[in-house]
Amino acid sequence: MLFRSKHGGGVGVFLGDVRPAGSPISAGGRSTGIVPWAQQYDLASRVVSQGGVRRGSFAIYLPIDHPDVLELLQSKDHSKGDPRRFVDSNVGLTITDDWINSMIAGDEAKQELFSEVLKTRLISGSPYLVFIDNVNRQNPECYRERGLEVSTSNLCSELTLFTAANHSFVCVLSSLNLARYDEWREWRGTSGLSVPELSTYFLDAVVEDFVHKASRITSMGRAVRFAQKSRALGLGTMGLHLLYQKRGLPFASEGARKLNLEAHEFIRSESEKASRQLACDYGEPEWCVGSGFRNSHLLAIAPTRTNSVISGAFSQGIEPIDANYFVAKQAKGTFVRKNPVLEALFCEKGIGAEIWKTILDARGSVQHLDSLTDK
């Protein structure tokens, strides 16, 4: 795990098979449970750099019915002052249909636990919730045909791939900037490829580069094996809300819904076209044989906090913008971020720069501005 982080990977860790605290151990003694293990991964994220560029990243997954789940949640809740708390690793819970249906049907113990889960999410932003039976129902056909079931997720919970004792799932990610969708929707390069097609070719090439380089690293054998058999990609998007604003569409409007479907259907169909062509040119990997595709997975909506800043997308992933003006503290420094669509609107209306101070005081809101209307 540490070597994967060192060489640039974000890591998801499933601890569901670890004995709960107090369980007897065959060699004598008692299990210390999940939390000490979680602390070790949390420490590792602080001392191991990710690709030599930034601090390592881990996400720890646990089934919601594991006896140690409450203790894990309390360790993530910074408000409780738990000395065993950890702050740098994310936490995720896998939830089965039976568990959630029982909770909804009135199981009081499960309802109390789920209430704690939601409180912790409100305070810390995690745990992620992965409805694992639903995930396996939606697995690609090549997975279902081979009985490849998913048990956990990745660092940021945007991917659900098979993993086992001799396979560690690997996926390469990139996101298209929907804030500039109107510019690249009809673009075709000299090769005749669309942006999603070209992006799929690029990501598949990154997989090949990973296999070539990681094959020379002994500790990466399981990851290389998975990449060779699956070649999973994760082409996503960012800047969706900014696209809506450029079109004058409220986030929850019917027009926004239609635009969302149009854009992502275009990306899906073009990415599939590229993967089919790649399969014709270079062959299908082991787990895709008979599917006609070069890649077991193609799309994933990842968080894009840094990428959205670099690319000018402003809004992260497919999330709504929560502030039009804010101060962002990042690894390279502290920066002021302004909504570029709003800034252009102010210029159009002749509204002076002093207006931004009032927006900052209103925590990024523009509800107080008489100079703006619903139209």
Residue ranges and their predicted role:
Residues 1-375:
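Long, C-terminal-biased catalytic regions of enzyme "large/alpha" subunits
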